[in-house]
């Protein structure tokens, strides 16, 4: 499977996935028509499908135009069907489906929105998490609760370390600075921060990243880490309380 990643709008990631065997191409979300069409033209691909992660405007703005141009089939969460509009196929939580010759799972990951989906290709170890899991970060809880987002992160943390993560926004540099405020003695985090700053200095993208790297450095995936809990002075609190505190601190960062 081939992947084309590019920037849309200001900091949205545009992502195209292409199955070489079938010739099928899909977009993960539809943040900007011009950027997506340019990427398709650059690769000489034709868009057949759009997988929507959630209903926020910066992820669905180009749906109508892309449907008109390519007659693409739009697939997304049943729970947000009315808010998204343009859906041709509505998915139930954790439903499995095919893209070309590949199987994918529409993992239910509520928190950022109540119907948020993360698309996981188990055979290829690819995860497209939308605005749920960011590199070194976590989506804001616009609709869900800390408990819901924690359960979503527990689900994602179970995926293999070699899984490649693609997410919805280039927020990694800011997330890295926040992570250091909580986990300053984490040498793996310091190395990751250095790498991120070097990439951004060249205006290069910081994704994809392996889930293993995220498990070792992303504070939102480390709610049960003893050192992090000690740094938060929350050694005896519940996982939910720790996760909620990290999210609260990020909101105020």
UniProtKB/Swiss-Prot annotation:
InterPro entries attached to this UniProt entry: Clx_II_MBL, Glyoxalase_II_hydrolase, HAGH_C, Hydroxyacylglutathione_Hdrlase, Metallo-B-lactamas, RibonucZ/Hydroxyglut_hydro
UniProt KW Mitochondrion keyword: no
UniProt: Zn(2+) 1 binding residues: 54, 56, 112, 131
Annotated transmembrane regions: none
Keyword Electron transport: no
Molecular function terms, GO-annotated: hydroxyacylglutathione hydrolase activity; metal ion binding
Cofactors, names only: Zn(2+)
Pathway: Secondary metabolite metabolism; methylglyoxal degradation; (R)-lactate from methylglyoxal: step 2/2
UniProt signal peptide: none
SUPFAM superfamilies assigned to the protein according to its UniProt record, in alphabetical order: Metallo-hydrolase/oxidoreductase
EC assignment: 3.1.2.6
Annotated binding of Zn(2+) 2, by residue: 58-59, 131, 169
Top-rank taxon, per record: Bacteria
Gene Ontology biological process terms in this record: methylglyoxal catabolic process to D-lactate via S-lactoyl-glutathione
Cofactor note: Binds 2 Zn(2+) ions per subunit.
Catalytic activity reported: an S-(2-hydroxyacyl)glutathione + H2O = a 2-hydroxy carboxylate + glutathione + H(+)
Keywords recorded for this protein, A-Z: Hydrolase, Metal-binding, Zinc
Pfam families: HAGH_C, Lactamase_B
Cross-referenced PANTHER family: HYDROXYACYLGLUTATHIONE HYDROLASE, HYDROXYACYLGLUTATHIONE HYDROLASE GLOB
Family, per entry: Belongs to the metallo-beta-lactamase superfamily. Glyoxalase II family.
Function: Thiolesterase that catalyzes the hydrolysis of S-D-lactoyl-glutathione to form glutathione and D-lactic acid.
UniProt-listed HAMAP family: Glyoxalase_2 (MF_01374)
Subunit structure as annotated in this protein's UniProt entry: Monomer.
Protein name stated in the entry: Hydroxyacylglutathione hydrolase
